[in-house]
Structures are given as C-alpha cells and as structure tokens.
C-alpha cells in the first residue's frame, strides 16, 4: 500500500490494463497519491469513462478517492510471461504494476468498490535517490 497522499509522478502502463493487452501505452499523471490525468488513446478514454461512472455511484465522501494510487508492486517471477492474465502479468520479473481505486482491503481509506491494475513491462522506478528498477532490471542502487 503506497503511503496515501504521497506519490507523485508519471506512470506509463505499456503491458496490460485490467487483464487486457495494450496496443498503445496509457499514461497516468499522479499528484499527492491521486491520478489527476489520463492519456493515451481509446483505452485511456475507456478508463476515464469508467472512473467517471464510478464517481457518479459512490458516496460523496469517496468521490475524490476514485483515482487513488491503491497498490504498487514489482514482478519477481522469472517464469511468468506477459499474457493478458492479470495475476500472471503483475508478477513478470522486471515489471511493475499499479492499482488505482479501492485500497480498503489493505487498510487504506479509499472505499470505492473497484480496482484497476496496470502493468509496466520494463519500467524505471526511482524512490528518492535510489534506482529500484532500471528499464526492467532490478537494481536497488543509490544514485
């Protein structure tokens, strides 16, 4: 569970989104732990529509939490392959995944009743001054 309200940056999902293989990447702009912008073709338009639909059906207190960065993880299984199977995709070695939406099962405050996961094939992941993953290679090296 990412620390709520703390994540900032750009996430480019280029593997699969919610178990669907992507032909073009979907870009999420995250500020203070919330997705504030989505771009990248027809799949991103579908995602925006889905999130708008969720916003119209949740409690008023949860509307701002629909875009919560709910999960972030790394794939570590060298035998897994990107296939469109959501559970396998998120564990491919060198990949990373994010989930947006509900994080209540992990103790978070976003209770919006849905979660969408996206997989990045060869990401670069930085945490302050440490490169955790460089172009899909697990490094955990200080810059």
What are the language-model segments listed below?
Residues 1-143:
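Metal/cofactor-centered catalytic core regions of large enzymes
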């Amino acid at each position: 569970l990412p620390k709520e309200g703390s994540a900032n940056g750009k996430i480019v999902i280029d593997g699969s989104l919610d178990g669907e293989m992507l032909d073009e990447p979907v870009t999420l702009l995250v500020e203070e732990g919330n997705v504030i912008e989505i771009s990248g073709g027809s799949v991103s338009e579908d995602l925006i529509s889905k999130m708008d639909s969720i916003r119209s059906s949740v409690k008023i207190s949860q509307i701002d939490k629909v875009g919560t960065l709910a999960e972030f993880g790394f794939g570590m299984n060298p035998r897994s392959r990107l296939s469109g199977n959501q559970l396998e995709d998120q564990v491919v070695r060198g990949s990373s995944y994010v989930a947006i939406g509900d994080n209540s099962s992990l103790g978070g405050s976003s209770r919006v009743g849905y979660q969408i996961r996206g997989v990045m094939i060869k990401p670069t992941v930085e945490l302050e001054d440490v490169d955790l993953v460089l172009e899909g290679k697990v490094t955990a090296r200080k810059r």
